[in-house]
């Protein structure tokens, strides 16, 4: 059974114009917002991250991306579109951008090396040939953004990782072995990042499914990102992923 709520919008009826304007402003600013309507009293309000009796229910709806009823309240979810910023136009990135788009993400590639990030290798994709930290600042990052670093080159990966750690991205994954990550951790600590910051990094990247080929590693990355999005209580763990 499907329940559909239809509201007129006009003078003296339906949602207040100010509420709709505020909703539109939040959407434009990429702020997750729930439009809440009590179907008994027809009270209406917007729920973001401010304290509200429906906050817990709204947060659960944000994570599931599903609107629905909580008692007499209809909660309409307005989440910003998902984005994935991939640093490093390497072989793994080719299947990953396709999988990301199928999963509902807007993928963007960052690689200053034009021979790697070429239109021939990534037809129709958004490619920024800029230094990663500058590119990430230009693109902007928020709680609906996943960042994946794949270059295996600290000169390119580290600036992107540092920029991502200063943001609210919901996922940050980095290619490299456990040994590579240990060296990365030392560099980040020297740069002033604490244990809580560094613990946000998923490395070695990807779910531990024994992936070997670029496509398989892309699948493992997509699986891990999905888990982090849908089960935000999960924390990064070191795995035996063969991403040398």
Locate each region found by the language model.
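Short beta-strand/turn micro-motifs composed of small residues
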Residues: 111, 151, 176
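Short amphipathic alpha-helix with an adjacent loop that forms part of the alpha/beta core around
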Residues: 133-143
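Rossmann-fold NAD(P) dinucleotide-binding segment
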Residues: 156-169
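Short, solvent-exposed amphipathic alpha-helical segments in soluble enzyme
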Residues: 99-105, 163-166, 189-190
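Residue-level detector of alpha-helix initiation sites
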Residues: 90-91, 154-155, 179
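Segments forming oxygen-rich coordination pockets for charged ligands
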Residues: 1-128, 142-145, 224-244
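Adenosine-phosphate binding glycine-rich loop
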Residues: 169, 174-244
């Amino acid at each position: 059974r499907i329940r559909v709520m239809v509201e007129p919008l006009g003078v003296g009826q339906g949602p207040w114009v100010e509420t709709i304007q505020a909703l539109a402003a939040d959407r434009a600013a990429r702020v997750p917002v729930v439009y809440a309507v009590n179907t008994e009293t027809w009270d209406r309000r917007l729920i973001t991250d401010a304290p509200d009796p429906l906050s817990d229910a709204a947060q659960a709806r944000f994570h599931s991306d599903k609107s629905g009823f909580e008692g007499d309240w209809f909660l309409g979810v307005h989440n910003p579109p998902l984005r994935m910023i991939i640093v490093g136009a390497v072989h793994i990135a080719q299947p990953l951008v396709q999988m990301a788009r199928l999963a509902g993400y807007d993928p963007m590639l960052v690689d200053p090396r034009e021979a790697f990030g070429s239109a021939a290798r990534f037809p129709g994709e958004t490619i920024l040939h800029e230094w990663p930290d500058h590119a990430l600042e230009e693109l902007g990052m928020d709680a609906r953004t996943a960042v994946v670093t794949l270059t295996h080159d600290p000169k390119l990966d580290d600036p992107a990782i540092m920029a991502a750690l200063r943001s609210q991205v919901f996922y940050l994954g980095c290619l490299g072995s456990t040994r590579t990550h240990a060296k990365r951790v030392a560099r980040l600590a020297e740069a002033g990042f604490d244990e809580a910051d560094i613990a946000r990094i998923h490395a070695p990247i990807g779910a531990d499914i024994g992936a070997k080929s670029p496509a398989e590693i892309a699948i493992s990355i997509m699986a891990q990102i999905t888990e982090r999005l849908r089960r935000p209580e999960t924390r990064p763990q070191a795995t035996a992923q063969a991403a040398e």
